[in-house]
Amino acid sequence: MQDIIGKIEDYSSKNGILLPDPVVEYVARIADEEKLKEPELQEMVRLFSRIAERNQGLDDDELLDAVEDDYQRILKVQELVKRKRARFPPKLIEDIAEVMKKHELSDDELDELIRRVRRAYDRARVEAGEAVGTVAAQSVGEPGTQMTMRTFHYAGVAELNVTLGLPRLIEIVDARKKISTPTMSIYFEGDLRYDEEFVRRKANKIGKSTLNDVLKNFSIQYADMSVVAELDEEKIQEKHLEYDEILAKVEKTFKKVEIDNNILRFEPPKPTIRELRLLADKVRKLQISGVKNIGKVVIRKEDDEWVIHTEGSNLGAVLKEEGVDKVRTTTNDIHEIETVLGIEAARNAIIHEAKRTMEEQGLTVDIRHIMLVADMMTADGSVKSIGRHGISGEKASVLARASFEETGKHLLRASIRGEVDHLTGIIENIIIGQPIPLGTGSVSVVMKERK
């Protein structure tokens, strides 16, 4: 029993949700009674992690009661679904159990709900042989022809420029490492999201501030070849900056500087007009606070909570800031999401960004088509573009690669390497005039050779 408890604790920590001891013991009893094997135990822990997540905020005893009730409801739904000979994914069964709990459904009402869900689920399933890739390509590509080519301001934030429309969709499917307008939406936890003063302090800490932002006076003294800057204490307090930190930054950056209270006097490395002007420019632009790669920040009130929108992006650094909601805070830089949160998060970001880009143009595309594109882009564990430098350029078939772009180069390389094309795909069979193996889930008839 102790061995099972150890495994359950290990699996739950991997899922990111540590189950309380009473729940762990309850799961261990079920696993012991049903003699669950390793994969089944892992699936059971995932199920209870999801149930525990839905019942957050309860103490251990209340949580155990809630988890037991939810589990019994799921078992009841599973039994009814099995009796109707329906095959639902686990998530759908959990959703039905959740509706049953929320609306306190009777047995007859639950029976009717399962019947309706089954009808809708069967209608939504793809028939074997449907060319889902072709349909997805048409469904995403056709609305793309109606999208605008211009870059608009982000809705509601006139100060920030964000790429929208077709240019943004091209950025997403090309998996560009350097996007034209990276931006972040930073949310806050608990009651901090309603605290305007706290959010403004965070905005000043995250956003870029230069020495020029906190100066009262600035002048170039040509007579004695120096640059004189006077700090403004009011501006420093407004931006919630530390006076000593600013001076430390100045002393670290400039070797020839004299500090007398609020007056800073800088001297150029060489006593020339050109060096003096370069020094003046460098003094003004000296960054005294802010997160790397983030420029301007804008604070907005959205549904009673304060949200920070940024120009530029640094997800890793922002998530380390105190009070930042690590679940909702996001960036439109997909490669940054992949680096910080992993490939599954990057896949979700591709889906969300592509869907939002189309919806902003008033275009509706079924999310499953976009999901298929995202699946193809992230299938091998890294974000790849849809083009000759990504998916299309890495196809196993020589003819398929040659048919897309750079035909001569692909054919020449393949002939040097002595590659063989086994003609298993669609494009290569069209090229040589053979029947094409079209359709997801379609089968081939194979004859067994006589020995």
UniProtKB/Swiss-Prot annotation:
Oligomeric and partner information: Part of the RNA polymerase complex.
Function: DNA-dependent RNA polymerase (RNAP) catalyzes the transcription of DNA into RNA using the four ribonucleoside triphosphates as substrates. Forms part of the jaw domain.
Catalyzed reactions: RNA(n) + a ribonucleoside 5'-triphosphate = RNA(n+1) + diphosphate
Protein name: DNA-directed RNA polymerase subunit Rpo1C
Pfam families, per the entry: RNA_pol_Rpb1_5
Keyword DNA-binding annotated: yes
Gene Ontology CC: one annotated term: cytoplasm
Organism: Methanothermobacter thermautotrophicus (strain ATCC 29096 / DSM 1053 / JCM 10044 / NBRC 100330 / Delta H) (Methanobacterium thermoautotrophicum)
DNA-directed RNA polymerase subunit Rpo1C: annotated span: 69-451
Enzyme Commission (EC) number: 2.7.7.6
Keyword annotations of the record: Cytoplasm, DNA-binding, DNA-directed RNA polymerase, Nucleotidyltransferase, Transcription, Transferase
Encoding gene, per UniProt annotation: rpo1C
DNA repair among keywords: no
UniProt-recorded Gene Ontology molecular function terms: DNA binding; DNA-directed RNA polymerase activity
